[in-house]
């Protein structure tokens, strides 16, 4: 039996596959220029396919973008929360995965625990897609890189500065850096540092990834500056986080240290006045609205790949 193509972590794929997905996303987006959102792509790679979406966390961009993506690929999506399902009453992940494998063509999970997604994938006979976990957010990084390339050309050779909490999104940037050939400079307080195992893996792949506690050093000369919320869903140390991360706010003075055509990204939702100022988020260097839209286009290519329509 052919093993399903799971999309769980970028480091489990190779650079050629990520490049294929990005090129496909660029082409699909360009081909749709001026189309209504509900019009199906010419090749309809998800025709007659059904995607199950399971949410253990609240979602705006992931929920709407995956639903729109499936519609544009010619398929459909079923949306549920864990509390809607028997998962919320004690049915095991393994039993749930076996049942859904008989009813849908792929499962996207936005989970509290990365281990839950891995357990789904171990027994599922259909592709499992990581829509966000506590450990990584690969779909977001594909959208981010798509956005960077739209505005600044190929990602290879670029320098990205991550400023703030070394969280799950930061981890996926670390995973991508050695595979796509960009430099990643991380600035974070020591108490909220990036995952050391991820850093070691990137180093083993000769990735140009570094970490500092100095945001100015990380941002200096960078092509792209990326921030994220300092307090994620489920975090209980709100006050401690704000105190530790206050020096890492991205404002115009920090952005002025970036390259002359440096741009700003944020996966949203943003806590305005905390990790980023209004002036940066709404300013001419911000690409966050294109970035949000590009979740659709990047995920369409992920889905097409999972279904075997490309690659």
Curated annotation (Swiss-Prot):
Compartments, as annotated in UniProt: Cytoplasm
Name the record gives this protein: Ornithine carbamoyltransferase
Enzyme class name: transferase
Catalytic activity, as annotated: carbamoyl phosphate + L-ornithine = L-citrulline + phosphate + H(+)
Family membership: Belongs to the aspartate/ornithine carbamoyltransferase superfamily. OTCase family.
Binding site for carbamoyl phosphate: 59-62, 86, 110, 137-140, 267-268, 295
GO molecular function per UniProt: amino acid binding; ornithine carbamoyltransferase activity
Function: Reversibly catalyzes the transfer of the carbamoyl group from carbamoyl phosphate (CP) to the N(epsilon) atom of ornithine (ORN) to produce L-citrulline.
Main location: cytoplasm
Enzyme nomenclature, EC number: 2.1.3.3
UniProt keyword annotation of Membrane present: no
